[in-house]
Amino acid sequence: EVKIPSCVKEIGSYAFSGCFWLHSIDFDENSQMKKISELSFVGCLSLEKISIPENVDEIEEGWCHSKITNFSISEKNKNFLFHQEKILLGKSDKNIEKFDSLLFAKRSIEHVIIPSFVNKICALSFYLCTNLKSVEFEEKSELKIIGKSSFNRSTLKSIIIPSSVVCIEDKAFLMCNKLQFVEFEPNSKLKII
């Protein structure tokens, strides 16, 4: 277990890289944490618990490569939303009101419906979701980008890609050994795979 002191404002890239036996991250009360950088917890495959403090206003793509099952966010944090207790949503720009980026999915999920207002599934969002069977998108999806390795090593079986998607980044479906069905909606705007 690691308890981050209240004076720490940022967790840098690779800060806990390879900490295989790390099980939980806690933050002191009155935490001043503002940013969790990309790849902060890469290789922390035993990490199961983290609670995001209220002052965090930036979580970078690919911040977490773990099997977190106990995830929470301070009710006072207005920058992120744990939607349906399954997916972490954030804002791509602090000046906008809507949560338009999907940053993380609870590793135990089997099925998820992604809200229409999400325009990017960020890198590694569904990485190691070993119970995932299907992903659906609400009607009139605004999704534009499926990020790098976003479904890497998941057990996704089927997906219908919304017509709004213009880019599927590198390794988005790498090692999806159970993937049997991929369909693109009519009038697809896809330009890059």
Per-region residue spans from a language model:
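Structural signature of tandem-repeat unit edges
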Residues: 1-10, 20-35, 44-58, 66-97, ...
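Consensus positions within tandem repeat domains that build extended binding/scaffold surfaces
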Residues: 12-17, 37-40, 62, 101-103, ...
